[in-house]
């Protein structure tokens, strides 16, 4: 699955956060560390993504909105 970076950026802006603020909350001293990820220049790791989503106020159950390829749930036989 691929992270929808446009959605990530839109949600950050909707929450009123700057790249500097997100980077700071991630514990990074430089905005560029976050900006490179948001712009697709550096891959976002699983733990980084979970932390960014949490900073934006999303629970783990809501993370699916950030993925471009949603896999349908498998139906289990009764």
Would you name each region that the model predicts?
Residues 1-14:
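A short, Lys/Arg-rich alpha-helix, primarily the initiator
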Residues 6, 17, 29, 44-47:
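Residue-level signal for the short linker/turn that defines the boundary of a DNA-recognition helix
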Residues 9, 20, 50:
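Residues within the helices of the helix-turn-helix
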Residues 12, 23-24, 53:
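The alpha-helix within a helix-turn-helix
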Residues 13, 27, 38-41, 68:
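Residue-level detection of the helix-turn-helix DNA-binding "recognition helix"
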Residues 16-36:
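Short alpha-helical DNA-recognition segment
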Residues 36, 54, 61-78:
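Short, charged recognition helix plus adjacent turn
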């Amino acid at each position: 699955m691929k992270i929808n970076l446009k959605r990530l950026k839109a949600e950050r802006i909707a929450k009123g956060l700057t790249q500097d603020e997100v980077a700071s909350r991630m514990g990074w001293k430089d905005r560029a560390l976050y900006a490179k990820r948001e712009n697709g220049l550096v891959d976002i790791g699983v733990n980084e993504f979970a932390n960014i989503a949490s900073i934006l106020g999303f629970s783990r159950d809501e993370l699916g909105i950030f993925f471009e390829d949603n896999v349908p749930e498998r139906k289990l036989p009764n």
